[in-house]
Amino acid sequence: MPARAIMFQGTGSDVGKSLIVAGLARALTLRGLKVAPFKPQNMSNNAAVTADGGEIGRAQALQARAARRPMTVHMNPVLLKPQSEIGSQVVVQGRVIGNAKASAYQAMKPQLMKAVLDSFHHLIADTDIALVEGAGSASEINLRAGDIANMGFAQATQIPVVLIGDIDRGGVIASLVGTQAVLAPDDAALIAGFLVNKFRGDPALFASGMSEIATRTRWTSLGLIPHFADARRLPAEDALGLPGGGVWSRDRPKIAVLAYPRISNFDEFDPLRLEDGVDLQFLRPGTPIPGDAAVVILPGSKATIADLAALREAGWDIDLQAHLRRGGRVLGICGGYQMLGRMISDPDGHEGAPGAVAGLGLLDIETTLTGDKALRDVEGRLTQDEAPFRGYEMHIGRTDGPAAQHPFLVFSDGRRDGAVAAGGQIAGCYVHGLFADDHLRAHWLRGLGTTASGQSYDADVDATLDALAAHLERYIDIDRILDLARVPRAIT
């Protein structure tokens, strides 16, 4: 039987599209269907390494996990990784093809649509149902010409659309009805139903609201979804979902993660954030590093040189010196590791104008940004105490120097990575995902004088996906969604 497909678009960003697709993927998988998540175009600096050696957005990685399928580049054929306010790195079917400003990217879309459709039909060849996620807002009609992410894709494949609105931010009736009003008639005709997400309170109080939306739009009402509190236990992809700073705990070690403007792969700190024995918070620019922090983490960055400038502008370079004088620890990961060195050179202009900038000088290393990108899963041991680890590499650049002769990690193939200085007080490496390894996380927390919960992070994510699936089974008419799904139009 040919695969069917249905698309989920939103009235705006952060309405819950990714989470709903993940929950439906798990629910339908538990029903015995072979599910494929798909997002034509994603914009995110949080990415995952796929089984076929490329990269996709973290949301699609979670959706693949929910569907219990190996990740493939075909689940997210176009990934945009913002490097500035007007430009992004463009990744097509898992491979970097270059950088483009927003205006130039528009001209690339006809060719990108070919890659999108190629990946989509490759993916559904061995699938019962494809759950397609749109991007941003369906109502951005200024971007409709050449669109590959929302209605442009839906029209090309002739698959029905479910529109999702977020009641938590207010104005959900206007956002749903208003979307229909601004869409071209042929695009609006593809919307078959709607969902209202993130409801809080008594659902009976919004029954008339659901009826009003259905009456005005003539769309099928598919469900009013209460807020899912455990969403915080799942990896977030967008910086919109990045937890803000709060009141620090008085009796737990404090871990401060510097959230510079182009922070990347920040979901790798979720396993630490969920541990009761520590208090991990992301610090926005303008928030000082607390004087009694146990560890300051410099995370990955999609624009290392620009984020290093932002770090200095925030005064964090001065805070780091004071932190080290008080005996605190510093850990740099990927771009954060590069920042810890003496110099970052970009001779070919991968991040902007060619040039070089001074680093923080906390590690005796220098980095040269190169065009080659390392993308691989890795494992090995820490050099200081032989603790095993698993993680992944996702970076450009070569780093070397005297401090690299004292590496932080040794891979199972004998390669070395990172650097350690000041008796272990300062360390850095290129490897992401270290803290998802339960054994390494427990080992690292013992070094802070606290203990891990003993829970498996992977098992916790899977249990949360099961709970999300049960939540959606209760509040969404999933049978009706299956009825609405259609066989996509073949593209020749």
Curated annotation (Swiss-Prot):
Record's keyword terms, sorted: Cobalamin biosynthesis, Glutamine amidotransferase
Matches recorded under SUPFAM superfamilies: Class I glutamine amidotransferase-like, P-loop containing nucleoside triphosphate hydrolases
Organism (species): Bradyrhizobium sp. (strain BTAi1 / ATCC BAA-1182)
Signal peptide per UniProt: none
Segments traversing the membrane: none
Annotated GO MF terms: ABC-type vitamin B12 transporter activity; catalytic activity
NCBIfam families xref list: cobQ, PRK00784.1
Active site as annotated: C334 (nucleophile), H432
Protein name as catalogued: Cobyric acid synthase
UniProt keyword Secreted, yes or no: no
